[in-house]
């Protein structure tokens, strides 16, 4: 309804935003820089954020930049797995015929990675999303999975993407060995008020709408209610646009944003 009223070609605040339309935040630049380094040197990287801050989207926009001719990427998002199921899913990602025993799966995966890195000269990257849900046994195995040639080669890059609690978990003594293998770490900060304002106006302009549709007070109210979460901000803005269209208003004010927030029960 609001798309037609505000002359939008699309809803720029929808979940299905393409990587090409990504708004360039400082968080996004920091994530890309760190993961670029990790993919060059190998090892394990840790990307954490509070829910809704855009960590998965940041990882996706980075992965979208990779050249499939020079980089083999395996993305895993089913993290609530047993140890054996984890290896089976990983083997499937590499296109390996799955063995029955864990030790055989482990060997076959490492041989595949070694072949890709040494024979085809490819970078090999595994992105594990929702990694805060990984079983303890899987986390402990990751350090062995990245151990090649008696720990003298780094053929594999593993990116752990998860909630902030994952960093707290890895700070415990049982994970000391894994923590020492972390090559890069980054905790996303979320959108500040200025970035949130620029984001909303930029996305409105890209959709064909008036970038100043929301006044400054409305944008400040939207940011204050989203807590830095881009997912929450998208929901608030979308709901405010719906309210504005229903009221046939070409101007979104703070009161509309507050109504939108209350309807979403975000307070």
Describe the predicted segments one by one.
Residues 198, 205-267:
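C-terminal alpha-helical "lid" subdomain
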Residues 82-85, 98-141, 150-154, 191-196, ...:
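Mid-core helix/loop region of P-loop NTP-binding domains shared across ATPases and GTPases
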Residues 41-61:
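Walker A/P-loop nucleotide-binding motif
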Residues 63-66, 166-181:
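Short regulatory helix/loop adjacent to the ATP-binding pocket of P-loop NTPases
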Residues 76-80, 170, 183-196:
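Conserved AAA+ ATPase "SRH/arginine-finger" region at the nucleotide-binding site
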Residues 92-94, 164-165, 173, 194-210:
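Conserved AAA+ ATPase "sensor/coupling" helix adjacent to the nucleotide-binding pocket
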Residues 1-41, 266:
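A short, basic N-terminal segment
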Residues 8-15, 71-73, 81-100:
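Conserved NTP-binding/hydrolysis module of P-loop NTPases
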């Amino acid at each position: 309804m609001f798309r037609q009223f505000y002359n939008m070609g699309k809803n720029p605040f929808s979940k299905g935003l393409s990587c090409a339309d990504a708004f360039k935040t400082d968080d996004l630049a920091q994530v890309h820089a760190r993961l670029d380094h990790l993919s060059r040197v190998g090892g394990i990287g840790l990307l954490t954020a509070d829910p809704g801050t855009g960590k998965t989207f940041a990882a996706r926009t980075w992965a979208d930049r990779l050249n499939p001719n020079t980089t083999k990427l395996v993305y895993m998002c089913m993290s609530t797995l047993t140890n054996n199921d984890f290896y089976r899913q990983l083997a499937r990602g590499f296109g390996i015929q799955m063995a029955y025993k864990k030790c055989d799966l482990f060997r076959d995966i490492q041989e595949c990675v070694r072949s890709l890195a040494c024979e085809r000269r490819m970078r090999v990257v595994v992105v594990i999303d929702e990694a805060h849900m990984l079983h303890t046994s899987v986390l402990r195995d990751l350090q062995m999975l990245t151990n090649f040639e008696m720990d003298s080669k780094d053929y594999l890059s593993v990116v752990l993407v998860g909630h902030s609690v994952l960093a707290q978990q890895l700070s415990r003594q049982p994970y000391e060995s894994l923590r020492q293998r972390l090559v890069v770490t980054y905790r996303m900060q979320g959108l500040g008020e200025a970035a949130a304002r620029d984001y909303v106006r930029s996305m409105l302009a890209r959709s064909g709408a008036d970038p100043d549709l929301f006044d400054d007070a409305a944008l400040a109210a939207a940011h204050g209610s989203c807590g830095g979460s881009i997912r929450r901000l998208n929901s608030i803005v979308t709901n405010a646009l719906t309210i504005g269209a229903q009221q046939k208003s070409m101007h979104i004010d703070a009161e509309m944003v507050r109504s939108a927030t209350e309807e979403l029960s975000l307070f």
